Design a protein with these regions (language model features):
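Catalytic core of non-heme Fe(II) oxygenases with the double-stranded beta-helix
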Residues: 2-78, 88, 112
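Catalytic core of Fe(II)/2-oxoglutarate
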Residues: 57-129
């Protein structure tokens, strides 16, 4: 997990998280007042979390499919990690703060294998191997 701190005119470019299955973002703080948008086409999008495309279904689709109101502090948005997303900049004083994380889904067999590997690693370190 990591925190993201954005201030006036800062943004998060379009990206996805290819190293996992599920991603999430929770809005922790949002500026009380956002100045009017610089350009007309940004109206209503300032500071917003935007999901684009269809994830693995269509990697070339870039039309926005959903806008999430980042001012809803405390909301947790879960989404497929392959889904392209970005955060638009905002104008005004204050901070947009969020908490993000990536997660993977594994089987019990995979988990048992990881635990066994870690045990062996620990034992080898104890023996100086």
């Amino acid at each position: 997990a990591w925190s993201v701190h954005q201030f006036e005119n800062e943004y998060n470019p379009i990206h996805n998280h290819s190293n996992c299955k599920i991603s999430a973002v929770m809005s922790l703080k949002f500026p009380e007042k956002i100045d009017p948008p610089v350009k007309e086409h940004l109206e209503g999008l300032d500071g917003a979390l935007i999901f684009s495309g269809m994830g693995d279904a269509d990697k070339w689709c870039t039309a926005p499919v959903m806008k999430c109101d980042s001012s809803n502090v405390g909301w947790l948005h879960l989404f497929p990690s392959s889904l392209q997303h970005s955060v638009y900049p905002f104008r005004g004083k204050g901070e947009r703060r969020s908490l993000s994380f990536n997660a993977d889904i594994i089987s019990q067999k995979q988990l048992d294998s990881i635990v066994e590997q870690e045990k062996l690693k620990y034992e080898n370190e104890k023996l100086g191997i």
